């Protein structure tokens, strides 16, 4: 036999299995465990999409990308606001720290619009809780 006939095609090693999230299964006492909930911004992203483009849909992949984007921006703003509070020797993150963090993280015109929308949202929330 030749050397080529003896060789087997290279096979891929099986991927390691990762522990899965809680699945619905019966435990020792017969009760079903519910699946672990994963919090996303999907419903909010969808509502905004329908406000701006009522006849447009969105794929799961696109929704996943937007969800990752929102989580990333949220984390950046929270981290920056935390640093600002620490610099000023405060243990509480206020609207002022969030606003400053947004100005530092987002570029130019985008920061201005974000600050104005944020201020408007806080004002609307404050007036609704007082009434």
UniProtKB/Swiss-Prot annotation:
Domain of life: Eukaryota
Glycyl lysine isopeptide (Lys-Gly) (interchain with G-Cter in ubiquitin), cross-linked positions: 124
PANTHER family assigned: HISTONE H2B (PTHR23428)
Phosphoserine: residues bearing it: 11
Entry annotated with the keyword Ubl conjugation: yes
Residue numbers bearing the N6,N6-dimethyllysine modification: 38
Positions of modified residues (N6-succinyllysine): 35, 47
Modification type N6-methyllysine: residues: 23
Region annotation (Disordered) ranges: 1-38
Residue stretches of biased makeup (Basic and acidic residues): 1-19
Cross-link entry Glycyl lysine isopeptide (Lys-Gly) (interchain with G-Cter in SUMO), positions: 7-8, 17-18
Effect of residue 11 to A: Desensitizes cells to H(2)O(2) treatment
GO biological process: chromatin organization; negative regulation of transcription by RNA polymerase II; postreplication repair; regulation of DNA-templated transcription
Disulfide bonds: none
Keywords noted in UniProt: Acetylation, Chromosome, DNA-binding, Isopeptide bond, Methylation, Nucleosome core, Nucleus, Phosphoprotein, Ubl conjugation
N6-butyryllysine, modified sites: 22
Effect after changing residue 88 to S: Confers UV-radiation sensitivity
PTM annotation (N6-acetyllysine): residues: 7-8, 12, 17-18, 22-23
Name of the molecule in the record: Histone H2B.1
Source organism of the structure: Saccharomyces cerevisiae (strain ATCC 204508 / S288c) (Baker's yeast)
Pfam families linked: Histone
Modification after translation, per record: Monoubiquitinated by the RAD6/UBC2-BRE1 complex to form H2BK123ub1. H2BK123ub1 gives a specific tag for epigenetic transcriptional activation and is also prerequisite for H3K4me and H3K79me formation. H2BK123ub1 also modulates the formation of double-strand breaks during meiosis and is a prerequisite for DNA-damage checkpoint activation. Deubiquitination is performed by UBP8 in presence of SGF11.
Record lineage: Eukaryota, Fungi, Dikarya, Ascomycota, Saccharomycotina
Any one GO CC term of the record: nucleosome
Protein function: Core component of nucleosome. Nucleosomes wrap and compact DNA into chromatin, limiting DNA accessibility to the cellular machineries which require DNA as a template. Histones thereby play a central role in transcription regulation, DNA repair, DNA replication and chromosomal stability. DNA accessibility is regulated via a complex set of post-translational modifications of histones, also called histone code, and nucleosome remodeling.
């Amino acid at each position: 036999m030749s050397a080529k006939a003896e060789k087997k095609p290279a096979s891929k090693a099986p991927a390691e299995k990762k522990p899965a999230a809680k699945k619905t299964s019966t435990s020792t006492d017969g009760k079903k465990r519910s699946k672990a909930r994963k919090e996303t911004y999907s419903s909010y992203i969808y509502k905004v999409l329908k406000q701006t483009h009522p006849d447009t849909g969105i794929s799961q992949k696109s929704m996943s990308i937007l969800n990752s984007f929102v989580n990333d921006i949220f984390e950046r703003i929270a981290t920056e606001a935390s640093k600002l509070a620490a610099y000023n020797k405060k243990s509480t993150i206020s609207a002022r720290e969030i606003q400053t963090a947004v100005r530092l993280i987002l570029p130019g015109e985008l920061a201005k619009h974000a600050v104005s929308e944020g201020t408007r949202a806080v004002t609307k929330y404050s007036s609704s809780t007082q009434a």
